[in-house]
Amino acid sequence: MPVRIPDHLPAAEVLESENIFVMSETRAANQDIRPMKVLILNLMPNKIETETQLLRLLGNTPLQVDVDLLRIHDKESKHTSIDHMNTFYRDFEAVRHKNYDGLIITGAPLGQIDFEDVVYWDHIREIIDWSQEHVTSVLFLCWAAHAGLYHLYGLNRKILQQKRSGVFVHRRTSQHFPLLRGFDDEFFAPHSRFAEMDVEEIRQHPQLQLLAESDEAGAYLVLSRNNRNLFVMGHPEYQKSTLNEEYQRDLSQGLDPNVPQNYYRNDDPKDDAIARWHSHGSLLVSNWLNYYVYQLTPYDLSDMTAMTPWESR
């Protein structure tokens, strides 16, 4: 949250140059505060586990957040009961007339399938297109990040020969984005995917900014220049056991998966896993919710044209 300071305080310029979030008394006095309304499109097989992971991160911020859960209406969930889906999830038709402060689109186990061949691809495209006019900021995770970059910006992904699974070191490519406030120079994040985006294509795209990358895992954080779309190539929401559960599942299916890198102590699946990314995941979601949702969204959600541009912040 911001530090409130007197108007024209000389320290303000220094603090802002250091990427410290300060707010003048005049601006603070004119702020309206209400709960943030966030929609989650949950595409992961285990709905309840993913709900818990994302709500854990959203609940670690000082903001009050009202959450709606969204499903693809004609896609039956194999791992979650119909009662749960009907009780807690909404179809797109029930929310298309609404506006939201934030939208989170999760990953999905579809890494080797062409986007156009995904059975509910038309629904995904429709929701992404809708979000560009009805949501202040969209957070795309893993598969959804690739899908969003493909649909919105025409970037193609490369299918990997082996699944990329593990916890990798990343570095910031810039010091001055609010999203990166509080980040260490290097930080860990988990990945679990069958594809990657071309880092150079991202760098050269006029509408995109590469904020963090890894020598081993490639592009990690990509932000659209209008600050409306954040693409996260990994899984900062994963709990400690998730990569192990995926590894054991793949083993049981006879897929001969690689051992997740930098995850088990001594890289031995018989040893305990080490969670190195929880603080980063919490800070990432907190910064997104604060700087790219709360600080930009209009108080009256019925008027999305009232979004405050970064230039005036």
UniProtKB/Swiss-Prot annotation:
It is an enzyme of class 2 (transferase). The lineage of its organism: Bacteria, Pseudomonadati, Pseudomonadota, Gammaproteobacteria, Alteromonadales. It catalyses: L-homoserine + succinyl-CoA = O-succinyl-L-homoserine + CoA. Pathway: Amino-acid biosynthesis; L-methionine biosynthesis via de novo pathway; O-succinyl-L-homoserine from L-homoserine: step 1/1. Substrate binds at K163, S192, R249. GO terms for biological process: L-methionine biosynthetic process from homoserine via O-succinyl-L-homoserine and cystathionine. The keyword Repeat does not apply. The active site is at C142, H235, E237. GO terms for molecular function: homoserine O-acetyltransferase activity; homoserine O-succinyltransferase activity. Belongs to the MetA family. Gene3D superfamilies: 3.40.50.880. It is found in: Cytoplasm. This is Homoserine O-succinyltransferase. Transfers a succinyl group from succinyl-CoA to L-homoserine, forming succinyl-L-homoserine. One of its GO terms (cellular component) is cytoplasm.
